Amino acid sequence: MLNKLSRLLADAGISLTDHQKTLLAAYVDMLHKWNKAYNLTSVRDPNEMLVRHILDSIVVAPYLQGQRFIDVGTGPGLPGIPLAIVLPDAHFTLLDSLGKRVRFLRQVQHELKLENITPVQSRVEAYPSEPPFDGVISRAFASLNDMVSWCHHLPGEKGRFYALKGQLPGDEIASLPDNFSVESVEKLRVPQLEGERHLVIIKSNKV
């Protein structure tokens, strides 16, 4: 698996240390094993996980600004855990309402010795934002409107929303509330992944 991961990273132009590659491969191995009992992801093949979960997460890293992030609806830790591995100086709160997912996240934290993640079982509307976050990340929300509505209390004054989407969501962008605007849309290149991927970066317009 390490060889395939190295080839994918090279194709994507991403440079990581051997330790980071080992951690990413170990995470995929854990996800594959736990998935059989916990049904954490519909992706069953570890090689496919490398593309659809690992690469698809870490291509976002260059666009993140700040040190404190929250991954809302993280599920089995996506994109939060891969991002935490490639950005060791940043901290990621991994938020999910389902206990079995959070148990898996805590086991990953323990086995991989990841000190820059905090798994939390909570609904997003009940989770306090003290202190506020530099970035709110998610690939779980059905729409951008849902994301800013449910998570509006989480980012700080200069914080951003980072939404991972497939095709460019023009209708969703057009229907954003007036107090939010799109700062940029980045087309993401994920080797061996079919279909388009975009990162939509949203800021609050409040003064």
UniProtKB/Swiss-Prot annotation:
Signal peptide: none annotated. S-adenosyl-L-methionine binds at residues 73, 78, 124-125, 139. It is an enzyme of class 2 (transferase). The gene is rsmG. It comes from Salmonella agona (strain SL483). This is Ribosomal RNA small subunit methyltransferase G. Its EC number is 2.1.1.170. It is found in: Cytoplasm. Keywords: Cytoplasm, Methyltransferase, rRNA processing, S-adenosyl-L-methionine, Transferase. It catalyses: guanosine(527) in 16S rRNA + S-adenosyl-L-methionine = N(7)-methylguanosine(527) in 16S rRNA + S-adenosyl-L-homocysteine. GO terms for molecular function: rRNA (guanine-N7-)-methyltransferase activity.
